């Protein structure tokens, strides 16, 4: 397969279509920053996929529960090892994503002889001061983005943009306003 690059590209394209189909029934995850902290919210009919990872890190996800659990456990272990070996202040969302989870997800996606992770992740990092919160979204192919005031995971990029556009129009300061805007 590696001798024929066009087949590899075709296989990667097929994986994208397959994974896009897997997220169509998923419940969106919304992360919004407010004056008292960060809200992660989902309206899942099943088990909510929201977790605490470390002191100032939380995780929200969409996808297959087993894949999310494996990625959550890897993040949890990585954060605690980093905090123990270095310093708790070294455990940041950016560090966990850039040097830990994103390369692993990317490798699983591009290794065509193995199953990819059926997961999208939103990592929220509570800032040391109000207004310094960060969100990182990781797609099923390992690509990630850093955002500041809010972030959304959903079935498609169009839905995410629509939800972000709605959140931009809201005046959000208190937790009550955040919950109202997120619902």
Question: Where are the model-predicted features located?
Answer:
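Long, low-complexity N-terminal extensions
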Residues: 1-183
């Amino acid at each position: 397969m590696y001798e024929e690059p066009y087949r590899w590209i075709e296989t990667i394209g097929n994986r994208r279509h397959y994974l896009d189909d897997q997220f169509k029934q998923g419940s969106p995850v919304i992360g919004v920053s407010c004056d008292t902290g960060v809200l992660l919210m989902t309206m899942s009919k099943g088990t909510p996929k929201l977790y605490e990872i470390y002191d100032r890190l939380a995780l929200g996800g969409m996808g297959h529960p087993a894949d999310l659990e494996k990625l959550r456990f890897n993040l949890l272990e990585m954060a605690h090892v980093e905090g123990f070996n270095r310093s708790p202040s070294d455990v940041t969302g950016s560090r966990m994503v850039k040097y830990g989870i994103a390369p692993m997800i990317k490798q699983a996606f591009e290794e065509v002889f193995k199953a990819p992770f059926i997961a999208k992740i939103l990592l929220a990092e509570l800032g040391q001061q109000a207004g310094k919160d960060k969100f990182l979204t990781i797609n099923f192919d390992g690509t990630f983005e850093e955002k500041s005031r809010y972030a959304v995971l959903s079935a498609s990029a169009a839905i995410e943009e629509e939800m972000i556009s709605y959140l931009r129009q809201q005046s959000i300061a208190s937790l009550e306003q955040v919950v109202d805007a997120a619902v």
